[in-house]
Regions:
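AAA+ P-loop NTPase catalytic core and its hallmark functional loops
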Residues: 1-5, 10-234
């Protein structure tokens, strides 16, 4: 799969269509599932789930990249804001290549729905979806799933696994929760070292809708900054 670009020439990786084994460094789920970092609760610089919401062309995807890299590197937003942009983009692509950041274009994955996101039946077998596979392979350090341009119906991808998104339901917490997936009958958990960063257009995702998920997601508004143009002749 070839890369593409979003916004002001920011490179992204079309990770949805890449063969997982060629990207992710932990093909053995049995080894990854026992790694202690999956239960680590010590990292508190960022929420487990962030939804960046704003009008078109206000830098939502750029903010998502900054957030994802900050999570991986353990740098807060103030530190990330003074990082040279080319360095941030280089690090972002490096983490995509290493399998620490998974970029998902929501319109692409939405066409497959739950089947492509969590799991699907393939004859007598069950095939893992991209979200389930990535979550199961989280081992040392931290991992980020970036979901770009979600819409009002995006939570339908999670179905029964949506309950696992809350911070206090993750692995290693006092209320750690597992759900039994309906197709594979497997017990599925979300590790504490997995973070979700999503973007949405404020016109598409109305306040009444995003308000319904504010217990699970920290909603970060992004607004235009017309003052930047003050005094400029355009």
């Amino acid at each position: 799969s070839s890369g593409s670009s979003t916004g002001a020439g920011i490179p992204i990786a079309a990770s949805v269509s890449i063969t997982p084994e060629s990207v992710w460094p932990y093909p053995d789920n049995a080894i990854a599932s026992t790694h202690p970092d999956r239960k680590d609760q010590s990292f508190r610089l960022y929420p487990k789930n962030t939804l960046i919401k704003g009008p078109v062309k206000t830098g939502k995807f750029h903010q998502a990249i900054m957030t994802a890299v900050g999570i991986i590197e353990g740098k807060d937003s103030n530190m990330m804001n003074i990082e040279p942009v080319p360095d941030v983009l280089e690090h972002y692509q490096q983490y995509v290549d290493e399998g620490r950041i998974l970029h998902i274009s929501y319109p692409d994955i939405n066409s497959d729905g739950y089947d492509g996101f969590i799991e699907r039946k393939c004859g007598p077998f069950t095939e893992d979806g991209i979200f389930k596979k990535f979550a199961n392979q989280c081992a040392d350090g931290r991992y980020v799933i970036m979901m770009e341009e979600v819409d009002l119906n995006w939570m339908h991808l999670f179905r029964e696994t949506a309950v696992l998104l809350r911070e206090n339901r993750r692995e290693g917490t006092s209320s750690e929760t597992a759900v039994t997936l309906p197709l594979s009958k497997e017990k599925f958990r979300l590790p504490s070292n997995l973070y979700i960063v999503a973007t949405c257009d404020s016109i598409v995702c109305e306040d009444t809708i995003t308000g319904a998920i504010d217990h699970d997601f920290f909603i970060r508004p992004v607004s235009p900054e017309p003052e930047i143009l003050h005094g400029m002749r355009i």
